């Protein structure tokens, strides 16, 4: 059967000029929809639902992609995590699991780098599982701590007992997100597989308690297919390798940046398509359910991984990153960024750099990843400085109401964000060190020069001067508001009030 199933993929591959494994991946994306519909209608017994999820996941890996060794890789990571988390009760437990699982994922990237192939391998699934397993380890660790030491997010994610092995393997091989994500925490899977996330919707007169999700699921499916069609069309018109040609090198600088932005946008379409398709299957299965909105309609964004509109029109780096690969960003934030920082202290540049370094290792071994993510760490720091020390001048003194030029600030921010990210993404796409540096050189290293200048400015006395001006505006506003409130206060009320001095406002932080 393993060979018979290849026949239609090889036939259409020669007909369409597409690699068979790409067609297999598309088949898995689309077939996940009817399988998700079946999963949703299975008896509510968790063991049945878990076994079905595991069976379809193994069918994709072994039956479709023939990744026999890959299944062993995933099983090793899963069982190592499960037993270490269960029996090693130490504060070092989550770090040991994190290092081993990330290191194993990185070693798979190294092997793929040394022996490149167009065939699908296990690394993509291993990357997804890396997020799930390391998050699982932290959830087990948090479950052994007093609630008083946990944040509200950690309390919700904490596991007070080790789950049944069947539940855990169902989580590992959950088929709608097995190949390209999205990743999510174990508690979400358990609440889904036991149907407890739907209990508030239960109707004693209806057999099915999960809300209907066919319409939003099909919406994601059509959008995903549209993005993939646009990617195939756009990549033939705006090929990435054009950036390495003499024609690109001889183009005017504005035309170069325009081409870079379009090329980066076309490259993103592939990710938009894959993530929309997998999100649709998750929605149809029910795990995408995220409660009710203010109109009492179901929300389907629990495992949403991308918001193309928010990303493309983001007016700052923070908003852009929050809209891209959203579940990976949640993982990086909750299980790297916040965990690296010492308890009681706010995360700083160390956490930022550690997060982007882990992100680069998680993506692969190619130099382009490290060029992108290390540069992104610095540009995110510059964006924080800008938001903290420049943005207030475009707000009214109450620091909430937009000033007359706030819209101009937002437009400039949107253009700068898109240009900066497109510039940095080039090395992520090219991967090769020499080629990445070559393209950046053709772009005059403008973004990197801006980063250096901005860091120098914000770490000079200029920052203190900006802060003093902001503080002066705020204090003047507070004093003026106080004086106005005094004018509207009766004499009797004033006798019962302690009047603050001007110094109280000047010393206000």
From Swiss-Prot:
Pfam families tied to this protein: MBOAT
Residue spans of biased composition, Basic and acidic residues class: 500-509
Membrane topology, as annotated: Multi-pass membrane protein
A GO biological-process term: glycerophospholipid biosynthetic process
InterPro entries: LPLAT_7/PORCN-like, MBOAT_fam
Catalytic reaction(s) noted: a 1-acyl-sn-glycero-3-phosphate + an acyl-CoA = a 1,2-diacyl-sn-glycero-3-phosphate + CoA; a 1-acyl-sn-glycero-3-phosphocholine + an acyl-CoA = a 1,2-diacyl-sn-glycero-3-phosphocholine + CoA; a 1-acyl-sn-glycero-3-phosphoethanolamine + an acyl-CoA = a 1,2-diacyl-sn-glycero-3-phosphoethanolamine + CoA
GO cellular component: endoplasmic reticulum; endoplasmic reticulum membrane; membrane
Gene Ontology molecular function terms on file: 1-acylglycerol-3-phosphate O-acyltransferase activity; 1-acylglycerophosphocholine O-acyltransferase activity; 1-acylglycerophosphoethanolamine O-acyltransferase activity
Superkingdom: Eukaryota
Active site: 363
Sequence segments annotated as region (Disordered): 488-509
Transmembrane segments: 15-35, 56-76, 95-115, 224-244, 247-267, 411-431, 442-462
Side of membrane Cytoplasmic, spans: 36-55, 116-223, 268-410, 463-509
Keyword Lipid biosynthesis found: yes
Lumenal side: 1-14, 77-94, 245-246, 432-441
Record keywords: Acyltransferase, Endoplasmic reticulum, Lipid biosynthesis, Lipid metabolism, Membrane, Microsome, Phospholipid biosynthesis, Phospholipid metabolism, Phosphoprotein, Transferase, Transmembrane, Transmembrane helix
Localization of this protein: Endoplasmic reticulum membrane; Microsome membrane
Residues bearing the modification Phosphoserine: 490
E.C. code: 2.3.1.23, 2.3.1.51
Function: Membrane-bound O-acyltransferase that mediates the incorporation of unsaturated acyl chains into the sn-2 position of phospholipids.
Family: Belongs to the membrane-bound acyltransferase family.
Protein name: Lysophospholipid acyltransferase
Source organism of this protein record: Schizosaccharomyces pombe (strain 972 / ATCC 24843)
């Amino acid at each position: 059967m393993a060979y018979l199933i290849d026949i239609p993929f090889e036939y259409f591959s020669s007909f369409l000029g597409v690699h068979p494994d790409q067609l297999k991946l598309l088949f898995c994306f689309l077939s996940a929809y009817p399988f998700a519909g079946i999963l949703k209608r299975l008896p509510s017994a968790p063991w049945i639902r878990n076994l079905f999820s595991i069976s379809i996941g193994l069918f994709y890996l072994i039956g479709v992609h023939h990744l026999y060794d890959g299944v062993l890789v995933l099983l090793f990571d899963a069982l190592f995590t499960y037993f270490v988390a269960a029996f090693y009760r130490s504060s070092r437990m989550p770090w040991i699991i994190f290092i081993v699982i990330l290191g194993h994922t990185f070693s798979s990237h190294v092997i793929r780098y040394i022996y490149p192939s167009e065939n699908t391998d296990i690394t993509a699934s291993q990357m997804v599982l890396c997020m799930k397993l390391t998050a699982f380890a932290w959830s087990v660790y948090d479950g052994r701590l007093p609630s008083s030491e946990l944040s509200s997010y950690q309390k919700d994610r904490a596991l007070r007992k080790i789950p049944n092995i069947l539940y855990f393997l169902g989580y590992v091989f959950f088929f709608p997100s097995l190949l390209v994500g999205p990743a999510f925490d174990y508690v979400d899977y358990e609440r889904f597989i036991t149907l407890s996330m739907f209990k508030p919707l239960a109707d004693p007169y209806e057999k099915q308690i999960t809300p209907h999700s066919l319409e939003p699921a099909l919406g994601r499916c059509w959008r995903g297919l549209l993005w993939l069609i646009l990617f195939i069309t756009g990549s033939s018109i705006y090929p990435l390798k054009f950036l390495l040609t003499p024609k690109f090198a001889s183009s005017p600088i504005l035309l170069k940046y325009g081409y870079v932005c379009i090329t980066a946008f076309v490259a993103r379409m592939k990710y938009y398509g894959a993530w929309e398709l997998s999100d649709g299957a998750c929605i149809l299965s029910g795990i995408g359910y995220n409660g009710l909105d203010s109109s009492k309609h179901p929300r389907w964004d629990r495992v949403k991984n991308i918001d193309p509109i928010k990303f493309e029109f983001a007016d700052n780096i923070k908003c852009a990153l929050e809209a891209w690969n959203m579940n990976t960003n949640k993982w990086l934030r909750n299980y790297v960024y916040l965990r690296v920082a010492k308890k009681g202290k706010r995360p700083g540049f160390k956490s930022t750099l550690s997060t982007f370094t882990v992100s680069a290792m998680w993506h692969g071994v190619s130099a382009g990843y490290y060029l992108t993510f290390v540069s992104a760490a610095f540009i995110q720091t510059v964006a924080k400085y800008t938001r903290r020390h420049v943005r207030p001048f475009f707000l009214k003194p109450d620091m909430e109401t937009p000033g007359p030029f706030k819209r101009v600030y937002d437009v400039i921010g949107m253009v700068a964000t898109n240009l900066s990210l497109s510039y940095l993404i080039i090395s992520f796409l090219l991967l090769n060190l020499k080629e990445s540096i070559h393209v950046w050189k053709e772009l005059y290293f403008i973004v990197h020069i801006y980063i250096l200048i901005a860091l120098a400015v914000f770490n000079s006395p200029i920052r203190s001067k900006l802060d003093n001006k902001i503080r002066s505006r705020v204090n003047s506003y507070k004093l003026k508001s106080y004086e106005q409130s005094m004018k509207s206060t009766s004499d009797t009320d004033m006798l019962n009030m302690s009047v603050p001095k001007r110094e109280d406002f000047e010393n206000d932080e």
